[in-house]
């Protein structure tokens, strides 16, 4: 079993199920197209992937997160000696099992791509070129993004599902603010890496979506429609499966209060 995340059980159970064979179903249409949600942390990628799963656009998930990848690779027979992941073999075995309507989707983050490509930009671009479509997910307010990332690390709670209670930050600003500063630097570095690589991919294959747009239903639907029109081979689009849960939107009051205190301190220091 995967370790329970935060104070709730629903998120942990969801990860457990997505790593298990429960979602492994060879698609009658085989595999004809691939896409990736390429994002820095805390940009709403989990939420977007939930929505795209509802829409039958593959089973997008964070397959290359080491904690999940090792578990999936072990049952697919893709672990080498010493527990090393054979990426190519794992992808080849996973894609036919997780395609839906002929489409495979995955979530991908900069550190995962760095690891998969052995820090080679040329290899990273070659990996990105395997995808027919690439969604760049970004966030305009990087300070709130860094605060969200710090909070997730402190609480070990990345999304909220069902009635899982939200856990607040319980450390002093003397501990929290250096974490936020470090995360701001990491986010800037990852953004630069992501956008520079994406600029080397065919621009017709790339679409950018901002976190701040995700609250608008038409933004999610626009991405789903774009993917289906490009990858659905002209077939009628399937009806969404609303039984599959979406993450709850977290109340940002705590994060905005932290932001105000952080900016006040920065202003005082300058």
Model-derived features with residue positions:
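Intrinsic-disorder-associated interaction segments
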Residues: 6, 80-87, 120, 139, ...
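The conserved 3'-phosphoadenosine-5'-phosphosulfate
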Residues: 55, 64-74, 164-171, 179, ...
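PAPS-dependent sulfotransferase catalytic domain
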Residues: 109-196, 204, 214, 221-234
């Amino acid at each position: 079993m995967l370790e329970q995340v935060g104070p709730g059980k629903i998120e942990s159970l969801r990860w457990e199920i997505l790593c298990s064979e429960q979602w492994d179903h060879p698609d009658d249409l085989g595999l004809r197209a691939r896409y990736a949600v390429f994002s820095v942390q805390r940009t709403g990628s989990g939420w977007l992937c939930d929505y795209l799963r509802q829409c039958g656009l593959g089973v997008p998930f964070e397959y290359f997160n080491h904690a999940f990848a090792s578990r999936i690779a072990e049952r697919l027979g893709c672990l080498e000696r010493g527990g090393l992941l054979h990426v190519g073999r794992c992808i080849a075995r996973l894609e036919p099992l997780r395609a839906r309507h002929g489409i495979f989707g995955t979530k991908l983050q900069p550190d995962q791509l760095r690891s998969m490509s052995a820090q080679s930009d040329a290899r990273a671009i070659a990996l990105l070129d395997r995808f027919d479509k690439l969604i760049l997910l970004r966030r305009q307010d990087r300070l709130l993004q860094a605060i969200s990332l710090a909070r997730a690390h402190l609480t070990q709670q990345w999304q909220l599902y069902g009635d899982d209670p939200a856990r607040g930050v319980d450390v002093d600003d003397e501990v929290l603010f250096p974490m936020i500063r470090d995360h701001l630097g990491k986010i800037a570095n990852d953004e630069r890496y992501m956008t520079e690589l994406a600029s080397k991919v065919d621009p017709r294959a790339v679409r950018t979506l901002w976190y701040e747009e995700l609250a608008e239903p038409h933004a999610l639907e626009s991405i789903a429609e774009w993917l289906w029109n490009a990858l659905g081979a002209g077939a009628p689009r399937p009806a969404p499966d609303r039984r599959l849960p979406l993450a709850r939107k977290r109340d940002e009051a705590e994060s905005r209060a932290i932001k105000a205190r952080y900016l006040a301190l920065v202003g005082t220091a300058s």
